[in-house]
Amino acid sequence: MADYLVKSLIDGGMFRAYVVDATETVAEAQQRHDTWSAATAALGRTLIGTMLLSTSLLKGDEKLTVKVNGHGPVGAIVVDGNANGTVKGYLQYPHTSLPLNEKHKIDVKKAVGVNGMLTVTKDQGLGQPYTGQVPLVSGELGEDFTYYLAKSEQIPSAVGVSVFVQPNNTVKVAGGFLIQVMPGASDEAIARLEQRIKEMPMVSELLLAGQTPEEILALLFKEEKIKIVQKMPVGFKCDCSKDRFAQSLASIQPAALQEMIDEDHGAEAVCHFCGTKYQFSEDDLRAILTEAQAK
């Protein structure tokens, strides 16, 4: 089934809740970057977290970039997201696999590391982008997104992100939730929610059991009134193109372009975000060089 995200209001606005099935999104990222298990889980969780952040914080054409660097074995993780729920992302070391942790699960904390920062840069089309940064408090990423929302956005929240990776490195399921506590929420309602989150299995386990985002919402808010505000398709989508890379090539020194023509007889550009390769022939490079010199 195609990935989708559900936005909802709980009890007339005590909470805003977002639940997403992002299985195909994370599976596509795994295939594009050939990630191994620990890298798949780390990148997947960051993709899901970014999707939840961008669909809850942004509107219109606004976009954001999440960077996670805990100086762990997977290196830096970079994910772009927008209000429409599409994401793209990559990490530094895709071929990272680690022994399972004491709970017999992928050791995301060790893969990501905790000696570093989570940085969110929001481009709201107002000129200078806004950047918020917090230290990594967990490395498991759900808690780190929660900490970011509390400290940088002043929104008390709960974030859960999880990915189930099969022994052959493919993604079986992936998903997550984000719950924002609104000013009208009672202490009793907050305590009840905290207890439910504590008792609830990971989202990936619920998806494995065939639960939908709507059913996961109902598990989180058993007694409360749920109003579904929007059900939106989400996915992995990259906006790279050969033209964009041609523009980048046009900005480098003419001598360097001439060298590519004379010595390499062409060039290959690879998109970090999606792995797509673009070939530029000698004629392509000559045309770019001629155009650049004419400016």
UniProtKB/Swiss-Prot annotation:
UniProt GO BP: protein refolding
GO molecular function: protein folding chaperone; unfolded protein binding
The keyword Phosphoprotein belongs to this UniProt entry's keyword annotation: no
Gene Ontology CC: cytoplasm
Annotated keywords: Chaperone, Cytoplasm, Disulfide bond, Redox-active center, Zinc
SUPFAM superfamilies, sorted: Hsp33 domain (SSF64397), HSP33 redox switch-like (SSF118352)
The keyword RNA-binding is annotated on this UniProt entry: no
Family, similarity comment: Belongs to the HSP33 family.
Purpose: Redox regulated molecular chaperone. Protects both thermally unfolding and oxidatively damaged proteins from irreversible aggregation. Plays an important role in the bacterial defense system toward oxidative stress.
Protein's recorded name: 33 kDa chaperonin
Taxonomic source organism: Levilactobacillus brevis (strain ATCC 367 / BCRC 12310 / CIP 105137 / JCM 1170 / LMG 11437 / NCIMB 947 / NCTC 947)
Lineage of the species this protein comes from: Bacteria, Bacillati, Bacillota, Bacilli, Lactobacillales
